[in-house]
């Protein structure tokens, strides 16, 4: 079992610096690539999930679905690894705030602000869909916005790829209720 903490080195290469976010499946850490010196993000499986093959498979699927995707509005996945029943994804560190935080701070965003962010997200999703991947959890908290107004779509944790075996049972719904497409909400997708 791997317990994420500052100073831990993954794959003899990525040193964890500080935790920056928590999710249902993992913790996201600011980390340093010891080979290049680059600061990256490391999504590390939560320790209590170590050894759980279902969650490890979801992390593998997330890495596989996001790894080859390249677009200015997608957070780039750089590496993936496993040890001791746990796993991690190394990705580009995106500096910014979740769109959900911007909305909470400012209320309704004017069209001049929100429309460019939505257009950027749509362009990212076009690349994702052309690669045969369905994100399945597009929501404001999975869109980071930097100081220059660049939006980055992240978190492919429940994504589905073409020719992949489903990770859900028939009729099982994955995603965030408020943001589900109608066909997802009814279990038809």
Question: Language-model segments: which ranges?
Answer:
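Activation segment signature within eukaryotic-like protein kinase domains
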Residues: 117-118
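Conserved short submotifs of the Hanks-type protein kinase catalytic core
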Residues: 84-98, 102
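Protein kinase catalytic-loop region centered on the HRD/HxD motif
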Residues: 121-133
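Conserved N-lobe loop of protein kinases adjacent to the ATP-binding glycine-rich P-loop
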Residues: 32-39
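Activation-segment/catalytic-loop signature of the eukaryotic protein kinase fold
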Residues: 80
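Protein kinase glycine-rich loop
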Residues: 16-23, 28
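AlphaC helix of the eukaryotic protein kinase fold
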Residues: 44-68
């Amino acid at each position: 079992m791997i317990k994420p903490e500052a100073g831990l080195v993954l794959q003899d290469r990525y040193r964890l610096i500080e935790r920056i976010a928590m999710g249902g499946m993992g913790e996201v850490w600011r980390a340093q690539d010891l080979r290049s010196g680059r600061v990256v993000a490391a999504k590390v499986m939560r320790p209590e999930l170590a050894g759980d093959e279902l969650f490890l498979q979801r992390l593998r699927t997330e890495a596989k679905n996001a790894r080859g995707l390249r677009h200015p509005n997608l957070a780039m996945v750089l590496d993936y690894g496993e040890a001791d029943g746990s796993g991690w994804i190394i990705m580009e560190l995106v500096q910014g705030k979740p769109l959900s935080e911007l909305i909470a701070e400012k209320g309704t965003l004017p069209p001049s602000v929100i429309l460019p962010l939505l257009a950027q997200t749509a362009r990212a999703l076009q690349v994702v869909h052309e690669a045969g991947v369905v994100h399945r959890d597009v929501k404001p908290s999975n869109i980071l916005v930097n100081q220059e107004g660049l939006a980055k779509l992240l978190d492919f944790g429940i994504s589905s790829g073409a020719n992949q075996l489903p990770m859900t049972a028939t009729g099982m719904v994955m995603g965030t209720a408020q943001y589900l497409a109608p066909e997802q909400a009814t279990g038809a997708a």
